[in-house]
């Protein structure tokens, strides 16, 4: 690196190449009207280019753009001494933002200023005679420096931010968002105290607070984030180490602004937003693997072994062409294991459905996260992203330096915020301690102690839907879920804790409304429709990565809703191949993939809430559930609860339903709020129970479950029917655990088993009742046929066998003649389907075979 002090003749030669008039004192700084491109011999990429103001303007000028001077530099800025940490970390390394350059802001949109080199700040007091006077004190030096191309006076900006941190008190602050803080004291001073205690050097700044405190400072942050944020870093570190001089942090405190007022819809981003701070929202649909990105390259001369370091500027490495020690050209070689790298991750963000205009497909944008922001979000998360909008050129050919005129855009992430006010709180390791205050937990526990809490929570679920109390209770237990059990260390594997529910019945009975309500409530919910879903759309598909051109796995709806609920409407209209992928997910909670050389097993710990309509558009009470919705029995047996939602066609019911619907339109909001539990309380209640309550089976509850299962088996054994399978016992265990979670109980008790048994029995009464006998027969769901139907089929086969034997040794019979003989012999009505079933039963016994219209004996 060249010396910061230069001879007057050298400085004059630089002025001759790009002369600019001096900037008047006190006026707003403007970008120079003209400045020709600097040649390669002026300075290296790691140096500051002097501004053409005065001969004294480049003497020991400190660096205030994104990175501070390299730690290998001989001259350190005086301002760097205010903190025990070195301000040598570029913003691209710590915030995910590339180093400060000269492109992007309105004053920099000129073709002749396209250099990516760092530039020195403008010296407003260029008429001072001596360099010694310029560096007399830190204060006098800071007040004279404005970052080139902006109106950001570094000293004033730093002073304003320090005043903001030390004085700002939010009058509209809520206790839920500021857990453990005194709202009458400066918020961000308490945040710095948290940093001292916890040791995480990140200070999140709400831009709304900054805007209410200082409009001009907020405007500078939005317009020039890559210059202002490092200044904020310096100010925050100075305050912190003045208060806590003995504190030791991993690295300097990084300020992370969020909630920028310049919140943009993803499709409305345009060139005027480039290099500005923006906040957008969406759903993460894909994350890449971690990519190492070089931040500082290490070069070694192959002749004299002289070494030098070069910092990377926006992905460009400026290899030194001449060794400064021996003056040998093209002798510098890059040493990879001595270079510095940082973590980088590419994230694809998709537009939220609620932000999409009518008739449009969702837009996607690319995010780049760096260092500790890597792996902060997973596919399926809904996030608000604050970052800097970037535009980078695309080369016509990788081997040619020419670039296209159309640029490629992305967002460098500064801050993630996983919040959605309409949904349940998604609890992760970073937020679980801050989510619930002691006061909030006390309110929730007081609510849990009430005897009617189960009914109150069920009534608060979809209050606009009339009646269906048992169905709402079943969905409520699905939201709570059972206790996750892992016995893999004992060789027994994992047992699923998720509850699967199927709603089937007449059209217009609020099935889809219930699905939409649950989808909008849970944080990792996915909503799909039967005809609009394919097997790969539900599971995973292989595609080429646009960056690396390698085959990668894209996850589908079931994997994206891991630890959530997947709502599937029109379940009966799914293709057979699409439904087949659900078998493994609904029982083993995993998804096995073997495609295009990619063999893996993905987690799909999701609850399935499905809705199906009958084949004949209206439920036929004379048919079984299998015959009505035409779903395979192997799939139906995996649902814990199957509810029928039928239209009773009763005048009294119709009158009550109409009164309820009309009341939704004329009742005031206050009346509706008084009737039902507060929505925020419901969300907190479910989130707390899912996170902290893990009930275990007690001795009494275990005995009650055993008795319930034995009784269910005993009911069917007398009539030759099976009324329960081990899957029904596991369903009872999950429902009992979920009911214990509703009570915030750490132990499953007898009342939980009784409610689970009642709910399970109510569901079976509707879905597993034999229409001919009116008796519950679980084999309808497990084998697709009731015990009476199976018995009738066997009896008819034996009658047909005797009829054939009575005809002597005739080797073949006509199909129609045999059918008419059987109908004439039997008193009961025999349909052609029943006759075919009897023939198939005898064919399975190798007694006969059917070829065309002829029945031949074997």
Curated annotation (Swiss-Prot):
General function of this protein: Acts as a component of the MCM2-7 complex (MCM complex) which is the replicative helicase essential for 'once per cell cycle' DNA replication initiation and elongation in eukaryotic cells. Core component of CDC45-MCM-GINS (CMG) helicase, the molecular machine that unwinds template DNA during replication, and around which the replisome is built.
Name of the coding gene: mcm4-a
Gene Ontology CC annotations of this record: chromatin; CMG complex; MCM complex; nucleus
EC number(s) reported in the record: 3.6.4.12
Residues binding ATP 1, per UniProt: 492, 638, 727, 730
Family from the record: Belongs to the MCM family.
Source species of the chain: Xenopus laevis
The organism's place on the tree of life at top rank: Eukaryota
Motif Arginine finger: where in chain: 637-640
Positions annotated as zinc finger (C4-type): 301-326
Biological processes annotated in GO: cell cycle DNA replication; DNA replication; DNA strand elongation involved in DNA replication; double-strand break repair via break-induced replication; mitotic DNA replication initiation; regulation of DNA-templated DNA replication initiation
GO MF, one annotated term: ATP binding
UniProt: ATP 2 binding residues: 466, 511-512, 613
Lineage: Eukaryota, Metazoa, Chordata, Craniata, Vertebrata
Name of protein: DNA replication licensing factor mcm4-A
């Amino acid at each position: 690196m060249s010396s910061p002090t230069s001879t007057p003749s050298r400085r004059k030669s630089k002025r001759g190449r790009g002369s600019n008039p001096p900037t008047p004192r006190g006026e707003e700084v403007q970008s120079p009207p003209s400045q020709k491109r600097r040649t390669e011999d002026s300075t290296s990429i790691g140096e500051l280019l002097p501004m053409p103001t005065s001969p004294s303007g480049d003497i020991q000028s400190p660096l205030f753009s994104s990175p501070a001077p390299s730690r290998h530099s001989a001259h350190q800025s005086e301002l760097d001494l205010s903190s025990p940490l070195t301000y040598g970390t570029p913003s691209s390394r710590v915030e995910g933002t590339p180093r400060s350059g000269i492109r992007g802001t309105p004053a920099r949109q000129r073709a002749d200023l396209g250099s990516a080199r760092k530039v020195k700040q403008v010296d407003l007091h260029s008429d001072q005679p001596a360099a010694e006077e310029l560096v007399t004190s830190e204060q006098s030096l800071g007040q004279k420096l404005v970052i080139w191309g902006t109106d950001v006076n570094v000293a004033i900006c730093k002073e304003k931010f320090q005043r903001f941190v030390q004085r700002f008190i939010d009058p509209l602050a809520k206790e839920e968002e500021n857990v453990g803080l005194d709202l009458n004291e400066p918020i961000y001073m308490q945040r710095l105290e948290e940093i001292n205690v916890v040791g995480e050097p990140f200070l999140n700044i709400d831009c709304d607070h900054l805007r209410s405190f200082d409009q001009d400072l907020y405007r500078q942050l939005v317009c020039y984030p890559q210059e202002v944020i490092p200044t904020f870093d310096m100010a925050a570190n100075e305050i912190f180490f003045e208060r806590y001089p003995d504190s030791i942090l991993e690295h300097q405190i990084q300020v992370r602004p969020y909630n920028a007022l310049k919140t943009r819809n993803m499709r409305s981003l345009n060139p005027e937003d480039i290099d500005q701070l923006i906040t957008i929202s969406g759903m993460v649909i894909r994350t890449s693997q971690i990519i190492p990105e070089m931040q500082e390259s290490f070069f070694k001369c192959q002749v004299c072994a002289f070494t030098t370091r070069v910092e990377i500027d926006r992905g460009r490495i400026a290899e030194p062409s001449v060794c400064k020690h021996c003056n040998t050209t093209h002798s510098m070689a890059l040493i990879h294991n001595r270079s510095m790298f940082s973590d980088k991750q590419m994230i694809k963000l998709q537009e939220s459905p609620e932000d999409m205009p009518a008739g449009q497909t969702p837009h996607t944008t690319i995010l780049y996260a760096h260092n500790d922001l890597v792996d902060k979000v997973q596919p399926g998360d809904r996030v608000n992203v604050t970052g800097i909008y970037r535009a980078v050129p695309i080369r016509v050919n990788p081997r040619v330096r020419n670039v296209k005129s159309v640029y490629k855009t992305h967002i460098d992430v500064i801050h993630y915020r996983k919040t959605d006010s309409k949904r349940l709180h998604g609890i992760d390791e970073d937020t679980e301690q801050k989510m619930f205050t002691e006061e909030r937990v006390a309110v929730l526990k007081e609510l849990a102690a009430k005897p009617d809490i189960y009914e109150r929570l069920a009534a608060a679920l979809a209050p606009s839907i009339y009646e269906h109390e048992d169905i709402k209770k079943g969905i409520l237990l699905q939201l709570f879920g059972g206790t996750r059990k892992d016995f893999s260390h004992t060789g027994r594997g994992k047992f699923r804790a998720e509850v699967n529910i199927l709603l089937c019945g007449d059209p217009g009975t609020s099935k889809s409304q219930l699905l939409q309500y649950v989808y909008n409530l849970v944080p990792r919910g996915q909503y799909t429709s039967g005809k609009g879903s394919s097997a790969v759309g539900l599971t995973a598909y292989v595609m080429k990565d646009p960056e690396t051109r390698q085959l990668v796995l894209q996850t589908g709806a079931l994997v994206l809703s891991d630890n959530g609920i997947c709502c599937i409407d029109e379940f009966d209209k799914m293709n057979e191949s699409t439904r087949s992928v659900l078998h493994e997910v609904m029982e083993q909670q995993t998804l096995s993939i073997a495609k295009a050389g990619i063999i893996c097993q993905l987690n799909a710990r999701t609850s399935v809430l499905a809705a199906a309509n009958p084949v004949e558009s209206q439920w036929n009470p004379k048919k079984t559930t299998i015959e009505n919705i035409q779903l395979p029995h192997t799939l139906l047996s995996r649902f814990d609860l199957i509810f029928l939602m039928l239209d009773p066609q009763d005048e009294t019911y119709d009158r009550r339903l109409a009164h309820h619907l009309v009341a939704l339109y004329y009742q005031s909001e206050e009346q509706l709020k008084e009737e039902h539990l507060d929505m925020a309380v419901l969300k907190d209640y479910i989130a707390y129970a899912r996170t902290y309550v893990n009930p275990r089976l007690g001795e009494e509850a275990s005995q009650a479950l055993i008795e319930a299962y034995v009784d269910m088996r005993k009911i069917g054994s007398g009539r030759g029917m099976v009324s329960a399978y081990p899957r029904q016992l596991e369903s009872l265990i999950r429902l009992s655990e979920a009911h214990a979670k509703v009570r915030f109980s750490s132990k499953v008790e007898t009342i939980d088993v009784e409610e689970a048994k009642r709910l399970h029995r109510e569901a079976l009464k509707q879905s597993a009742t034999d229409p001919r006998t009116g008796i519950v027969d679980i084999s309808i769901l497990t084998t697709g046929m009731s015990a009476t139907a199976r018995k009738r089929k066997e009896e008819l086969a034996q009658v047909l066998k005797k009829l054939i034997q009575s005809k002597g040794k005739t080797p073949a019979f006509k199909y129609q003649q045999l059918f008419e003989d059987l109908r004439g012999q039997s008193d009961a009505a025999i349909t052609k389907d029943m006759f075919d079933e009897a023939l198939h039963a005898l064919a399975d016994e190798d007694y006969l075979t059917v070829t065309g219209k002829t029945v031949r004996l074997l």
